Design a protein with these regions (language model features):
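Conserved SAM/AdoMet-binding glycine-rich loop
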Residues: 1-80, 91
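Alpha-helix termini
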Residues: 7, 105-114
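Short acidic (Asp/Glu) and glycine-rich catalytic loops that position anionic groups and cofactors
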Residues: 11, 78-83, 99-100, 147-156
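Structural beta-sheet core signal
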Residues: 17, 82-84, 119
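Soluble or luminal CAZymes and related metallo-dependent hydrolases
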Residues: 26, 65, 95-98, 166
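Catalytic cores of alpha/beta
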Residues: 29-30, 89-106, 131
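Hydrophobic, well-ordered secondary-structure elements that form the walls
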Residues: 44, 82, 103, 117
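Flexible glycine/acidic-rich beta-alpha junction loops that bind and position SAM and/or redox cofactors
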Residues: 52-57, 86-94, 110-165
Length: 166
């Protein structure tokens, strides 16, 4: 692995990586290996801290992996950044609040050196899998307002969850 090669070649470096929360990160002290190789920050596309929403996104992530990985990083001193999305089709306001509260009510996470998070609004872009079958996500209408004729994305109407305006 990249981390093992850095250690093997005795390269003295600090580095940042972008990862997905995966069960394999929790095996064989892999996070510790990352730290020993110089990793000091990991950036994760968490997207949501709600299992139903993660499943709808087809992320293939379990919340327990998020918790366990975060705990391991905090224990070792690896800073983390979480990208979060709100307004994914079918997502409800209480589900968005699960993500917000995961961060705001987790004092240990907030106090961990270098922690950061950003919450961005979901943008349905042209060519995304949702565009091919919008009804699967409760989307009844996709459109681009005339004043956004150069937009790469869509505005949409939905029968489930929050609208794109919400």
């Amino acid at each position: 692995t990249f981390a093992a090669k850095i250690i093997e070649q005795k390269v003295d470096v600090q580095w940042t990586g972008e990862l997905k929360f995966e069960k394999s990160l929790l095996k064989d002290d892999r996070i510790e290996l990352l730290y020993k190789s110089g990793c000091r920050k990991l950036i994760f596309g968490l997207e949501s801290y709600n299992q139903r929403v993660l499943d709808a996104m087809k992320k293939g992530v379990e919340l327990s992996w998020v918790d366990d990985t975060s705990e391991a990083c905090m224990k070792l001193g690896i800073a983390m950044h979480f990208y979060l999305i709100c307004g994914f089709p079918t997502e409800t306001e209480p589900e968005v609040m699960d993500s917000i509260n995961f961060v705001l009510n987790n004092q240990r996470l907030l106090d961990s050196p270098g922690f950061s998070a950003i919450l961005s609004q979901f943008d349905l872009e042209r060519g995304a899998p949702i565009e091919k079958n919008p009804a699967e996500w409760g989307i009844t209408k996709l459109y681009t307002p005339p004043e956004h004729d150069l937009s790469l994305g869509y505005t949409y109407e939905t029968t489930i969850g929050m609208s794109s305006d919400e």
